[in-house]
């Protein structure tokens, strides 16, 4: 009897271990602010790495969420002028569920590059998926930005836009 019971418990444990589980995004209580960062930094669990010398934010398996009531009238990610966001892989997401919380804010020129996909979701009519103070916002390679905003997809305060590559794709949902 005890052997049957033990076999049943072990079988149940093995089956439960084989079940798919949900992976939850890291909640942002404070913004990722790279504007005055002079040292390299990374959070592999959240899926980002900052190269200070080239002002490049690399995202690979990025999974960040700003919960409701946090970072209101701010942004999830702040970048300095002449920054680059290098997108790797197709499993990158940035969600802002807070009032007027932009996804990515840049002080000036912002470049997206890489062969990956980044999904940015904002949950406020007064928020932008991408907000550039000076612009331009440039897309290289075959980077794909899938934006699902309640507000703006891209907002450039002092627009000087250019699109030098025909290999970009902006998908609106």
Predicted regions span which residues?
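A composition-driven surface/loop motif
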Residues: 5-11, 24-173
